[in-house]
Amino acid sequence: NSEFHDSPSTVTEPDDETQGIANHLIAFFEKEVAEDRLPKNLGPLQAGIGSIANAVLTGLKDSNFEDLIMYSEVLQDCTFELIDAGKMKFASGSSITLSAKYGEKVFNNLEAYKDKLVLRPQEISNHPELVRRLGIIGINTALEFDIYGNVNSTHVCGTKMMNGIGGSGDFARNAHIAIFVTKSIAKGGDISSVVPFASHIDHTGHDVDVLVTEQGLADLRGLAPRERARAIIDNCVHPMYKDALNDYFNRACERGGQTPHILREA
């Protein structure tokens, strides 16, 4: 029945951790622009679905960036918040999913957004050649990542599926800059989101350029595996787990290898 409303998405409010991630990302973007590696409006942005990516993109409201554009698969609250704030001038997607709060506002005022949105077939929104040609910056959420930059975005503890890979694979593999964000710890600190060896891998280190937690940002572009590990441990790991990961990495390096591991412990 076309009169049925969409089921609203569950979106948690931004917090200190997501604001920290946003701040690190904004600083990274500012540096890229200053060094002429990105245009002043950053170029097309893609945002993965979920509370963390949504909160991080919303953080761009407090940045100096203007005339932002989005080329994504699913448009969520952050898209419309940036449009309402005058920060984003246009967004392209294949579908819209909104919280109950924002859904009512948007769907009751579609006239206000009709010249700022376009919805395309998924074959176009996620097309690898288009993603690459447009120079998209892909920002997606990780459940965990390991010290070499391999990202698990779907399986809790490697076995329990939390969500599908969605469009993150399409965008991460083909984006100009592939960024993954997550909080450095989960379950109140009982679990580190940065691990020696990812329990499930959706995105290999070859497809990952930048990793961000509230602790900091690791720019992995052009780095060898050991350099990637050092950048991730130094910048992304929560202090509760930094000593343990440093110890693991140092002992693994003593064994040698291009990508050192102690598989019995990893």
For each predicted feature, which ranges?
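Metallocofactor- and cofactor-centric catalytic cores in central/energy metabolism, strongly enriched
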Residues: 1-121, 130, 134, 144-148, ...
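Residues that form or immediately flank small-molecule/cofactor binding pockets and catalytic motifs
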Residues: 124
